[in-house]
């Protein structure tokens, strides 16, 4: 069973549900999906939300190894994504890079816009968006204790100051394809609406919007027995 945690934000609830559906619909291996919700982390996550935290899960994502009991492997994903791949591929990658502490897509880019969804500030820093898809080898991420996550700076967390560089494995960049930053790619495996997704009026015609709306329709479907 592969445990998957999806960041949950109260202003993007539909994004969580569509992403979860897109994963379940394509996976040929057992996956367990859980929302990473601040309201469920009382007593574990104690810090106040900072002005540069654009989502409710900006920093709670780094609690995934602790929430997993520092055992096994766990996946974290931002909610503003659409899965177009079988998660069996992630399991295979875990097998190939079992010596690493965390696997990420190593983006090297500068954001094209100073603002993103809901007019929020686009913070620029090294290793931007590496943390939006993380595959944790939980036993090797014990530095991410609740005490550390509650006290470390956001930049130190997102820039992976908690792990040695040689322990950061690399995933194909197509597994976190940045919509609005990268050109359209028919082979993208996980589409990331990092500037804003089609559930926001401003981005309803963004790249891959039609695919997302189709996934929403499929998620809403229920066959009624008569």
Could you tell me what each predicted segment is?
Residues 1-2, 11, 17, 29, ...:
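A glycosyltransferase accessory/donor-loop signature
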Residues 94-157:
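Conserved catalytic core of nucleotide-sugar-dependent glycosyltransferases
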Residues 31-68:
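Active-site-proximal specificity loops/subdomain of glycosyltransferases
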Residues 22-30:
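Short, acidic, metal-binding catalytic loop of nucleotide-sugar glycosyltransferases
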Residues 12-13, 83:
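Alpha-helix N-cap/loop-to-helix initiation residues
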Residues 3-6, 23:
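Hydrophobic targeting segments
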Residues 60-111:
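GT-A fold catalytic core of metal-dependent nucleotide-sugar glycosyltransferases
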Residues 47-53, 116-121, 185-188:
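Short, surface-exposed amphipathic charged segments that create phosphate/polyanion-binding patches used
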């Amino acid at each position: 069973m592969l445990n998957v945690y999806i960041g949950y934000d109260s202003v993007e609830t539909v994004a969580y549900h569509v992403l979860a559906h897109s994963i379940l619909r394509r996976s040929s291996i057992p996956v367990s999906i859980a929302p990473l919700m601040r309201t469920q982390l009382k007593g574990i996550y104690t810090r106040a939300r900072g002005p540069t935290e654009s989502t409710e899960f900006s920093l709670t994502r780094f609690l995934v190894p602790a929430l997993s009991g520092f055992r096994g492997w766990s996946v974290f994903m931002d909610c503003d994504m659409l899965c177009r791949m079988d998660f069996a591929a992630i399991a295979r990658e875990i097998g190939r890079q079992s010596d690493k502490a965390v696997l990420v897509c190593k983006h090297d880019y500068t954001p094209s816009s100073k603002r993103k969804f809901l007019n929020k500030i686009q913070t620029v820093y090294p290793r931007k968006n590496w943390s939006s898809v993380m595959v944790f080898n939980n036993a090797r991420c014990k530095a991410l204790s609740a005490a550390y996550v509650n006290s470390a700076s956001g930049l130190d967390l997102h820039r992976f100051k908690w792990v040695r560089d040689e322990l950061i494995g690399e995933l194909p960049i197509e597994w976190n394809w940045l919509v609005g930053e990268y050109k359209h790619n028919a082979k993208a495996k996980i589409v990331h609406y990092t500037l804003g997704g089609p559930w926001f009026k401003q981005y309803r015609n963004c790249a891959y919007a039609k695919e997302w709306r189709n996934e929403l329709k499929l998620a809403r479907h229920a066959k009624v027995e008569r």
